[in-house]
């Protein structure tokens, strides 16, 4: 009876050989895995833990000498300061330098501009006019005196037809009676002229007439 059902199952297709089942089971095992090449295992990309960048440390700089910087700003180099100095017009000497005195003995009025130029260069001038005619000498004195007044200079007579003219930067003083006075403080002596008295009077004449 069992053989009949077995044949019927084989005929219909329900009955499969046991070997086939066994092979199928084996294929489901290790042999099944051998049919396809094994794929290499792909490692998941792991994000490398990069260390956070450390903040850059400030550079150690040598301390700046502030006093030196201040002194350099306040006191520029000597060459630079000398190049930036603008001299006064007509001034050839620095303040505090040795004063220069020029002695001139002109022979004509045409030489007077040289005296004015020397005063503009802040030089003192001793003017000796003894070599000039009296009228020319008086004209020369008036001319130089006017120019000296315009530059705030000083003038003084120091001898017969000899005059001293100085710029405003020169202080001239003289000693009289043991006391020192500036030339501009010495009062000018006033000369009063009057006719000389006659050696004889009218009284003797009256007596002679008698």
UniProtKB/Swiss-Prot annotation:
The keyword Repressor does not apply. Residues 13-78 are annotated as: Disordered. Its main location: cytoplasm. GO terms for biological process: division septum assembly; FtsZ-dependent cytokinesis. Residues 47-60 have a biased composition (Basic and acidic residues). Residues 64-78 have a biased composition (Polar residues). InterPro entries: Cell_div_SepF, Cell_div_SepF/SepF-rel, SepF-like_sf. Keywords: Cell cycle, Cell division, Cytoplasm, Septation. Residues 22-31 have a biased composition (Acidic residues). GO terms for cellular component: cytoplasm. Disulfide bonds: none annotated. It comes from the Bacteria. It is found in: Cytoplasm. It holds the Pfam family SepF. Cell division protein that is part of the divisome complex and is recruited early to the Z-ring. Probably stimulates Z-ring formation, perhaps through the cross-linking of FtsZ protofilaments. Its function overlaps with FtsA. HAMAP family: SepF. Belongs to the SepF family. Homodimer. Interacts with FtsZ. This is Cell division protein SepF.
